[in-house]
């Protein structure tokens, strides 16, 4: 890396690439909801309520997904965007 490379402005990602990534996330989320068991929405809500007891997060900061694999087992994926600590 040369010294000039350090001072160059960094290019922001292309908006088309960003839109494509967001669309892929939405499609994957909707696909997961179709295959989820009947109890999944209630379980998801209860998990979010437990997290809110300890951390102030909005509903858009918590992602709960259930993935079915070919090996006859399920994977529950939970992503929480935690607020910055001051």
UniProtKB/Swiss-Prot annotation:
Membership in a protein family: Belongs to the MinE family.
Function: Prevents the cell division inhibition by proteins MinC and MinD at internal division sites while permitting inhibition at polar sites. This ensures cell division at the proper site by restricting the formation of a division septum at the midpoint of the long axis of the cell.
Keyword Amino-acid biosynthesis on entry: no
Keywords, alphabetical: Cell cycle, Cell division
Annotated source species: Shewanella pealeana (strain ATCC 700345 / ANG-SQ1)
InterPro entries referenced in this protein's UniProt entry, alphabetically: MinE (IPR005527), MinE_sf (IPR036707)
Gene Ontology process terms (BP): cell division; regulation of division septum assembly
UniProt name for this protein: Cell division topological specificity factor
